[in-house]
Structure formats: structure tokens, C-alpha cells
Amino acid sequence: MEIPILSELKLKGIEPEVIFWVGCAGSFDDRAKKVTKSFVKILNNANVSYAVLGNEESCSGDPAKRSGNEFIYQMQAISNIELLNSYNVKKIVTTCPHCFNTLKNEYPSLGGSYEVMHHSEFINTLLRENRIKISGGSFKGKKITYHDSCYLGRANKIYEAPRDIIKELDIDLVEMKNAKSNGLCCGAGG
């Protein structure tokens, strides 16, 4: 699977539409790596002009901030912001709710102002623009539920984009007792 690296595109004078911020989990956690690969397939199928930072990407700093180490957080964040600004990045998409929240809501106070989207929002946009299509396939007639992550849901009020995508699968979306703003934390940090 070929994944464009921002520094290489810049050397060729190519400005990608969006930067895919992979994040620590998306790079190292086996389960999250599957999400990363699947999202890259979607980007490629939709002919999205995108790039990743590759070896230049560092942790967003969220774990340091959440564990109370503001110094380490700011060092990581400022380093990332300087890198992103040096590339004149305007739009970032990420699959990680923690990275999403940090890049969108915390980086601006340190000089990093970007349009930041969660991949569910980005995929939903691709669907609305007819850049990708989903066929119901083997999901027809099945029931599914969706868990709202803390940082995507309650922290950023993104509830409908994931559900809109699920509805495209031609399945029966069944809401949990505690959903959306009443959702419960899964305990896994996302």
C-alpha cells in the first residue's frame, strides 16, 4: 500500500488537499493500525489528495497533558505546530478522537490553527459529495449499535456523522440506552 509522505510531495511541488494525522495508536496499536489501513484505502478509492507526515509525525501530546505534565505536552505540541506551520498545513483529518480533540481545540492557543476533522466527518463528506459509495452487502437486515467516544461525542458534539455512515450500510441502527450526550466512557481513553 503506497502512502504519500508530505515532505516528498512538497519536494515535487504538490500541495495535498488534507494531511492524515495517523496518531500513536494508529501507528502502533494492532487494532488501530487496521483502522489506519482501512482509512487509507478509503482515501485512495475516493482519489483524495492527501499525505502523512511519516517519520516527522510525533505524538500530539495528549497523553502528557492528560497525565498532568503540561511542560511535556507543550514541548510536543509546539514542535508539531512548528512542523505543520512550516508546511503551511490547512486541513487535517485523524482517526483518533484524542488527537482530534487536541489538534482542534488545544493547538490553536499555541499557534496551530487548522481545520481538523475526524475521519467519520470526512467520510461522511465524501459520501455526500458522491466521491465514494457504500453498498449494503452482507449487512442488510443485521442490527448494530454505535458507542460514542468521550472526545468525539461529549467533548466535541459529533454524534451524527458516524451514524450517517452506519445507516448507509442498510442495517438497523439500534441506539444503546446511554447514547450520544448520555454515553458512558468505555474506559479505553477515546
Give the ranges of each region predicted by the language model.
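Iron-sulfur cluster-binding electron-transfer modules in prokaryotic oxidoreductases
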Residues: M1-G190
